[in-house]
Amino acid sequence: MVQIGPLAIRWYGVLLTLAIFLGYELARRRLRAWGWDLEPFERVVFWAVVFGVVGARLGYVLTSPGYFLENPLEALYIWHGGLSFHGAILGGGLTFYYFHRRRGYPLWPYLDAATPGVALGIVAGRIGNLMNGSDTAGRLTTLPIGFTWPEWARGFPGVCPGIDDISEVYRCAELLRGPVHLTQVYGAVVGLILLFLSLYWLRKRPFYGYAFWQFVLWYSVLRSVLEEPFRLNPLWLPVYRNDELGIGLFTATQVVSLPLVLLSLYMLRRLGKGEASRR
């Protein structure tokens, strides 16, 4: 974080902003190559970003209802951290759908073209989490990959003073003891995998909507397998917990991911059949 007088510039916001602009440019180039008019896309993308952020914050708030019922104004303080990528995809996707229904803008080509940008956003967000220190904390672990934060890394101690919520106190205490799963890096790896996969899906593209639904499918799977089991998040369905290895099942994200996987498979099959019937 860089402090300029009363203004705090956080790595998280800087990196996400860069990812948005780069993703926007990649989408424009892809749509131009496909022969689509760019003007409608340029109109809708601003609102897609706005409602993507709203959806991301709302998704995070819904996973911690107790805290935000007691502190409702905190739901507006997005700079305090806490965004859900599932919520971002939903908010942005619904915005594209609204403009599709109201103004006839293309839906699936726009969503397909946006997938590399979303992947970049995941990578940027997780690197920002790492720079902030206290975000997306990992569970304690005895595995060799466990990481102990050095004393000079002030991100975690900085969030501990003055905390009233007992779960946050526990989170701070756990992180200070270490070693922990470095889940910020796990999440960035998920984003990188999705970036390369999305570029492959766009080249393959047997039909419009293919890249988008493949993205939703594999984001849900990869995050549920490679990141969520190791994060210090409450278990909505406490099916399995190993405090020695630092593994827990199932978090809210994992629970939400299952219907998204099923929906993605259904939509891929449906859109694929529609394309086959037109041939």
Swiss-Prot record:
Enzyme Commission identifier(s): 2.5.1.145
Pathway per the UniProt entry: Protein modification; lipoprotein biosynthesis (diacylglyceryl transfer)
One of the Pfam families matching this protein, by short name: LGT
TM helices/strands, residue ranges: 4-24, 44-64, 76-96, 104-124, 182-202, 206-226, 245-265
GO molecular function: phosphatidylglycerol-prolipoprotein diacylglyceryl transferase activity
GO CC terms of this entry: plasma membrane
Coiled-coil zones: none
Membrane topology: Multi-pass membrane protein
Keywords: Cell inner membrane, Cell membrane, Membrane, Transferase, Transmembrane, Transmembrane helix
Binding residues for a 1,2-diacyl-sn-glycero-3-phospho-(1'-sn-glycerol): 126
Places the protein is found: Cell inner membrane
Xref: InterPro entries: Lgt
Listed GO biological process terms: lipoprotein biosynthetic process
NCBIfam families according to UniProt: lgt, PRK00052.4-5
UniProt function note: Catalyzes the transfer of the diacylglyceryl group from phosphatidylglycerol to the sulfhydryl group of the N-terminal cysteine of a prolipoprotein, the first step in the formation of mature lipoproteins.
Family of this protein: Belongs to the Lgt family.
Name under which the protein is recorded: Phosphatidylglycerol--prolipoprotein diacylglyceryl transferase
Originating organism: Thermus thermophilus (strain ATCC 27634 / DSM 579 / HB8)
Organism placement in taxonomy: Bacteria, Thermotogati, Deinococcota, Deinococci, Thermales
